[in-house]
Amino acid sequence: MNRIYRLIFILCAFCGIAQAQPERPKLVVGIVIDQMRWDYLYRYYARYGEGGFKRMLGEGFSVENCQIPYIPSVTAIGHSCVWTGSVPSIHGIAGNAFVKDGKIVNCVGDNTVKPVGSDGKAGYMSPRNLWVTTIGDELRLATNNRSKVVGVALKDRAAILPAGHHANGAYWFDDKAGRFITSTFYMDKLPEWVNKFNKRKLAEKYLSQKWETLYPIDTYQQSTADANNYENGIVDGEKAQLPLDLAALYKKHGYKIIRNTPFGCNLTFDIAKAAIEGENLGKNTDTDLLTISCSSTDYIGHQVGVNAVETEDCYLRLDQALADFFAYLDKTIGKGNYLTFLTADHGAVNNAAFLQDQRIPAGIWNGKSMVKELNQELKAKFNTDKDLVMTIMNYQVFFNTATIEEAGLDYAAVKQVVVNRLKKEKIVHYAFDMEKTSTE
């Protein structure tokens, strides 16, 4: 009898646990902030409002010690890892661009598809190079396609790779057309809600104003003075010093300038809201998924660095945009009915010249120069006039294998010469032949 009572107690206990499980969210929103360093959460914390980053820190859970087991950490790889839970050797995305079948390819480039919503080259994109499924793919499969999955971003790869193969749609910004587009991989024509959104011409509205600091510029104490020698310009050839006349820059550079302003993030959240309404996300019996990537933080970071006034101002404005978006979700989906997470695809380091001026050891790796040096050494060593090294990408050396084979050279010997040469470089920590990793 005691055994029976114990069994009943255990079964009842498990029943209680099952009944206590919370309901599944109606909508999951995953937000990736391109190039956001972890310390930005706290570096600008005192200036954030209560509804954005602070709300996430206060109401959510923060992973304070997250490490990545792969190299390099760039946009395409980072987004793929976040949304597939795998690494480059498994998901197949080895960089923003990489060598495939002896040719350098765009991570999402696909000439077998055609643009939808544009006639430009920006639409020849798909997730075909992604070898595995995303969270959204698995969600669609698990619910027999009842769940909806949509991805939005300015960058094509930041919309496509998170959304995956089986998404209802992925939409990215075409600089030439000034609107969000997709490809025939997903559909043959844009949904009406996307057409309506594009007709609003929000990019033009954002670019009709000036980009001024959100607060008095002398209060930006976390940044280097705005006029400095560590920046490339807001776009190459255009000085990065606020305020910026965006209307003049738009007239000169076209729609692409939106990427290099904080308002690119606002535009991204605008289409995210349109997607929620247009696809009725969060209104179904099964959980839906929306992937969002804020790309402007990366463009700005590359142009002016991590210590710039423009970068600080971008994150202060992003905080406001997040607060507005969360308030929108509270109203449309209902507080407690959605689950959101925020992460980054990769971080960034200070400008090397800036670090050197602070007496901190730093330098820059010149891959193109190294390719020339390696080819010169190989030509002399193997008595050939052909370039044996194709390129250096993503910390990897790629060879012209057909040329090596035609010349009758020992491929292993060629690689060893390169390994030995790279080991002499002070900036190179370790060099090895990938085919020998199990023995070295």
Predicted features along the sequence, with ranges:
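Beta-strand elements within well-structured catalytic alpha/beta cores of enzymes
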Residues: 26-37, 56, 82, 139, ...
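His/Asp/Glu-rich, glycine-adjacent segments
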Residues: 87, 95-286, 295-302, 417-434
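Loop/turn elements at helix/coil->beta-strand transitions in domains of secreted/extracellular proteins
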Residues: 24-29, 59-63, 90, 144-149, ...
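Bacterial Sec-dependent N-terminal signal peptides
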Residues: 1-24
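Stable alpha-helical elements in mature extracytoplasmic
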Residues: 32, 37, 49-53, 78-79, ...
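Short, structured active-site-proximal loop/turn typified by the sulfatase FGly-forming signature C/S-X-P-X-R
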Residues: 41-90, 148-152
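Secreted, luminal/periplasmic, and some membrane-associated catalytic domains
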Residues: 48, 64-65, 74, 96-124, ...
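Second-shell loop/turn segments in exported
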Residues: 37-43, 68, 121-127, 255-262, ...
